[in-house]
Amino acid sequence: MSSREVTSRLREKVWNGSVPLEIRLHKGDCRTYDDSDAYLIQFPRLSYLALLIHKLHAFFAPSLIYPDIHPSDLWFSYEGVPLKWHYPLGLLYDLYSGAEPYHPSDSPPPSPTTPSKQDSKQPLPWRLTLHTSAYPTTQLIPLDNNNLQIHDLFIHSVKEADYLRTGTGKTVMFLSQADSTQLWDAVVKHDFALFNPINQKLLNPQGVNLRHLPVRLYLPHAGVDEEDRGMGSVRVVQSLVKVEVGSRQPQTIGTALNQILPTLFPSRRSALLAQAVLHGAVVPLGASVEELIRSVAYLDGWLHIAIVMMG
């Protein structure tokens, strides 16, 4: 199988990846004595919970204590931890669900919608709580009723990724209005046929060589007191990741992690203390970062990698 075919298959698997969700209204926001019905959905890993708020508002409206609440007042939590709605669902799941990631040495690999043996240790669907009051403004960015905030944050992230890749960010700035609209429509509709042509333009700018690769690392962060430790705090780490290292050798996940987090990744070849998890799977340290960017990056062009401690 050619490298192009491998890339295409990986891209397809990642695009079709999803997480079954069971979303329930918080008891303090529910007007009935018993819990309201749960909202069940198979939601794309690449997408954003913020894109669900209007459907959830309509579904739970009959059960709300204050039915005239605005959709922008809704927010999600998991086991008491507010979930950042501008993080892709897959990243949130990898960070907080507690599910064991799939390892390349395991066989057979799970399908995009079927949990692996490791996932079975964490009950599915992933059970989230929807709130309509007490919005945690110190932890979450405020939403708006027209999805303008999530649109703006997404486009800003796309521009950041483009700036790192090209050094200018002009590829995004020079997109036509039609292309920019199509990119966002592809995100909202989760439509690969709309997304791929624009994504290929961003990844392959004419006459420009890639300079750096957009990678963000997310680490569990222990607070200074018990209260902080219980809030699922995460530290985001970012550094310039070159396309090549040494004598024009491709940058690998192992060399990048050894550069950015040498304490957790003292070896470039073997995971000793922590693992890099992307789309629910442990990333081999020998994997090329550029190839991952081209095949399995999130919709904004970034590799959002969860760092999971071993043992």
UniProtKB/Swiss-Prot annotation:
One of its GO terms (biological process) is protein transport. It comes from the Eukaryota. Pfam families: ATG5_HBR, ATG5_UblA, ATG5_UblB. Residues 102-122 are annotated as: Disordered. Conjugated to ATG12; which is essential for autophagy. InterPro entries: Atg5, ATG5_HBR, Atg5_HR, ATG5_UblA, Atg5_UblA_dom_sf, ATG5_UblB. One of its GO terms (cellular component) is Atg12-Atg5-Atg16 complex. Keywords: Autophagy, Isopeptide bond, Membrane, Protein transport, Transport, Ubl conjugation. It is a peripheral membrane protein. Its main location: membrane. Disulfide bonds: none annotated. There is a cross-link at residue 159 (Glycyl lysine isopeptide (Lys-Gly) (interchain with G-Cter in ATG12)). It is found in: Preautophagosomal structure membrane. Gene3D superfamilies: 3.10.20.620, Autophagy protein Apg5, helix rich domain (1.10.246.190), Phosphatidylinositol 3-kinase Catalytic Subunit, Chain A, domain 1 (3.10.20.90). Belongs to the ATG5 family. Involved in cytoplasm to vacuole transport (Cvt) and autophagic vesicle formation. Autophagy is essential for maintenance of amino acid levels and protein synthesis under nitrogen starvation. Required for selective autophagic degradation of the nucleus (nucleophagy). Also required for mitophagy, which eliminates defective or superfluous mitochondria in order to fulfill cellular energy requirements and prevent excess ROS production. Conjugated with ATG12. This is Autophagy protein 5.
